[in-house]
Each structure stands twice: as structure tokens, then as C-alpha cells.
Amino acid sequence: MRVLVLGSGVIGTASAYYLARAGFEVVVVDRQDGPALETSFANAGQVSPGYASPWAAPGIPLKAMKWLLEKHAPLAIKLTSDPSQYAWMLQMLRNCTAERYAVNKERMVRLSEYSRDCLDELRAETGIAYEGRTLGTTQLFRTQAQLDAAGKDIAVLERSGVPYEVLDRDGIARVEPALAKVADKLVGALRLPNDQTGDCQLFTTRLAEMAKGLGVEFRFGQNIERLDFAGDRINGVLVNGELLTADHYVLALGSYSPQLLKPLGIKAPVYPLKGYSLTVPITNPEMAPTSTILDETYKVAITRFDQRIRVGGMAEIAGFDLSLNPRRRETLEMITTDLYPEGGDISQATFWTGLRPATPDGTPIVGATRYRNLFLNTGHGTLGWTMACGSGRYLADLMAKKRPQISTEGLDISRYSNSPENAKNAHPAPAH
């Protein structure tokens, strides 16, 4: 069976790899000149299942109003003329209840934990190297109110069986020694020892090479124009004026997925959340991070690679604007020098931006559609790297008519519609 995968970011490449392992003949098509050259290129570098949380959370609407007035706020909104921006924000607001937050976080943690296990298995089987570390993630709280509010997340972690530690200042210095010098700025932390880090772009590039070894064909520099369909099936994909055909099609185009789905009558609420990162060369390894820290105040992650520090975060709801905002660089530099003033050379840092494909409830869209041979793997938001291996393997199992290893509840596009025309196709029953 031939499968055409659209997109070669970490999600598309992982999909291709696991589909090839399942015995499919796979062709990957992408407009870039290689894998992971857009959103997967310079993300924060975290594989953090326990911190898989939706942006839509209780209290966020009030916080957002406050953030809009702050210089170093984690969120910014630039209104556009695109109606989908307003529709997406309204759907997000509807998910900001305690009940919806708990449901959405459970779905995200379920897929993220599974994905981390798949990554562990892949690394053990293949030895794939990507400057990875398995030293956990530490969420830093600058105020007592932040530490107290973490209790709700801890309750979800306990229900999901995710190990955690609550740290005082001495505990923070134990796991991140370089922070001992700035301990007075912190009141405590939440550490998840099973979280990991790694260079997503490096991982994706090497996974693509492994996929080629399984027979996957990558076609780069290809302009994907539209999907050709009739009835309940996709007939092909128009690429550079040529109709490419296959038995099945996987759409893994991140924020650009809705543009191809709209003519098919499929409304996928995926919208770009613009994020930024700095990549800083390390000058003093002892004063650099050991693994990943999350600054709860600014919603920024600081991650250690071999000889580099990756600082990433923030969210701009601004459409498809890829311009580099110097104020965002200033924020990332401020946070880095505030916590790790002696760790790296900020003057030599590389500044980058990417468009995270976000759903209003935080959970990605992975699974079948009302078109019998069209599958989606998109909408992973800030967690594409965290969820990549699990999403790829989960989708490959569905397409191979195998029983997935985790529950399918709430993961496909049917959760966004009560209409029978968007109901998911028949596939193996949920694992739970």
C-alpha cells in the first residue's frame, strides 16, 4: 500500500518512519529543501510529557488581558482580517474552564507519555543521536502564588501516574547547580525527572535518513497546491502541476493544514502560534543549564544541548507573520542573563521564529477523516517534538488496522463536530 505524506517536519518524518516500519510504501513531499526546516528547526528542545498542558486554562483570559500591557509578556495578540483567527480565539476561550482543562490535559499527557516511551524504544533500538539528555525538566516559580497554583497540575500528574518532585531552593540548586547564585529570585520548583531534551532538527534529519533506509522517498522543493477528491476518497495531490497518487494520504503540514482541508469541507481549527528562540553558544559549561528549566513567569524554556543553550517560548497570535520582533529577542536575552548570566555568549546568539500549529483545546488532531483514505497528523502546538514519535506510531497502527497502544478517545477531528459527515471512519476499537 502506497502512502503519500505531506510535510517533512518532525511530525511528518516520524509518520513516514513508522509507516515504513509497518510495511507501507511511503513518499514524503515538502516545499523546503530538507526535513525540519520550518517549525521543527529551532524549537525549545524539550520532550516534556508531564508539562503537556493546554494554553486554554482557568484564569488565562484575565492573565491575557494583563499580559497585553506588559513588556516581557508571554502572550501577544496582533489582530488580522482573517476570520479564522477570531473563531480560533473564541474556541480557545470556551476551553478555559476547569472541566475542559482537565479533559484536554489528560489527552495531551496520554499521547505525550506514550510518545516519550516510543522515543526511548527508538533510541534503544537504533542508537539515534540528537544531543539528547534524560535528566528531567524543572519548572521554576518566582512567586508563592505560582507554587500554590501548581497544585492543580500536580493532581493531574498523580492521576496520570507521572513521577514528580516539589523542590525548595536547595533542591533547585541540587538539580541545576548554576541556579544556586540566583536562588533568591525563586521560591520553589516542580521537577519531572522522566522528561528529556534534545535537538529536534537534528533528530528529524537523522530519522529521515533512517526512513530512507527503510525505503521512504523524500521529494523536496515541491509546491503542494491542492487535494483532488471525489465522493469520500482522495484521488491525488496536485504538486508542481503534477497529480501524485497513492492509496492513502497523510496531512502533516502544521499550521498550513487547514488551507488544504477547507475545499474538502473539513474544518480543522489549527492556527499558528508564533514562537521565538535564541541559540546561545556555551562559554562556561558549569554555569549553563544541566537539562531544561521552565520559567513560569515568562513561559520560557531554557534547554542545554552539547555546546549550546536553546532559549524558547512566548506566543504571538498574529497569523502567518514570520518577521523577527526585536522586542522578543530582548525578552529572551533578559531571561537568559537573569538566570544564567555566566553560561553563554548572548552576543553570538542566533534568533529564530516559527509557527506552532495549535488547536484551541491543545490536543493535536491525529487520525482518520470522513474521507476514507485521508488521515491527519497536525495541530501539536508547542509539543510537536514531545508528541512526534507517539503520534507517528499511533497513526501507523490505525492505518495498518492494528489496535493502538493507547486510547483513541478525543484524538481525531470528530471531537470538533457533531455532524455525521465529519465522523471518523471505522478503525480498531480504543485500547481502553
From Swiss-Prot:
Summarize where FAD binds, as residue positions: 3-17
Keyword field: FAD, Flavoprotein, Oxidoreductase
GO terms for biological process?
Answer: D-alanine catabolic process
Q: Could you tell me which Pfam families the record lists for this protein?
A: DAO
Pathways involved? Amino-acid degradation; D-alanine degradation; NH(3) and pyruvate from D-alanine: step 1/1
Q: Name one GO cellular component term.
A: plasma membrane
User: What is its induction behaviour?
Assistant: Is highly up-regulated by L- and D-alanine. However, it is likely that intracellular L-Ala is the signal for induction of the dadAX genes through DadR binding to several putative operator sites.
State the SUPFAM superfamilies in the record: FAD-linked reductases, C-terminal domain, FAD/NAD(P)-binding domain
One GO MF term? D-amino-acid dehydrogenase activity
Task: Tell me, according to the record, the phenotype of the null mutant.
Answer: Cells lacking this gene lose the ability to utilize D-alanine, D-histidine, D-phenylalanine, D-serine, D-threonine, and D-valine as the sole source of nitrogen.
Q: What is its EC number?
A: 1.4.99.-
Q: Which cofactor does it need?
A: FAD
Q: What sort of enzyme, by top EC class, is this?
A: oxidoreductase
Among NCBIfam families, the record links this protein to: PRK00711.1
Q: What does this protein do?
A: Catalyzes the oxidative deamination of D-amino acids. Has very broad substrate specificity; all the D-amino acids tested can be used as the substrate except D-Glu and D-Gln. Participates in the utilization of several D-amino acids as the sole source of nitrogen, i.e. D-alanine, D-histidine, D-phenylalanine, D-serine, D-threonine, and D-valine.
Protein's name according to its UniProt entry: D-amino acid dehydrogenase 1
Gene source species: Pseudomonas aeruginosa (strain ATCC 15692 / DSM 22644 / CIP 104116 / JCM 14847 / LMG 12228 / 1C / PRS 101 / PAO1)
